[in-house]
């Protein structure tokens, strides 16, 4: 991934042990996939990254929130997740996340400018 160093720097991740795309099923059998997973043993955190590209701030809908919760639940139940790690939902978007009823599901946000400059994370 071309911009992995910028994402790592923006999120202030000390080291990334593995990065990959992931797919699996939640305990109730629903499918789930993540655009990018970053594992950091140093931070004891798995960063589940969702990428959304729009002309403005991305507004998270109720359906998005349910989908993200399903992805988190599915990954938490998978063999790929180190059970001692926390899971953080990271949105990589063009212009950031619009404030709204469902935005609190997101732990951190990376915007397009972060990928091409030294500006840091937008923590929600």
Residue locations for each model-derived region?
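A cross-kingdom feature that marks ATP-driven nucleic-acid transaction machinery
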Residues: 1-124
């Amino acid at each position: 991934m071309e911009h992995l160093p910028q994402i790592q720097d923006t999120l202030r991740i000390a080291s990334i042990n593995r990065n990959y795309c992931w797919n699996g099923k939640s305990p109730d059998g629903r499918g789930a996939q993540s655009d990018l997973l970053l594992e950091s043993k140093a931070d004891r955190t798995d960063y589940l990254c969702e990428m959304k590209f729009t002309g403005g701030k991305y507004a998270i809908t109720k359906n998005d929130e349910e989908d993200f919760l399903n992805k988190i639940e599915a990954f938490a139940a998978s063999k790929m997740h180190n059970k001692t790690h926390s899971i953080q939902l990271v949105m990589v978007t063009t212009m950031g996340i619009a404030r709204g009823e469902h935005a609190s599901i997101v732990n951190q946000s990376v915007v397009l400018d972060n990928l091409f400059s030294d500006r840091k994370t937008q923590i929600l």
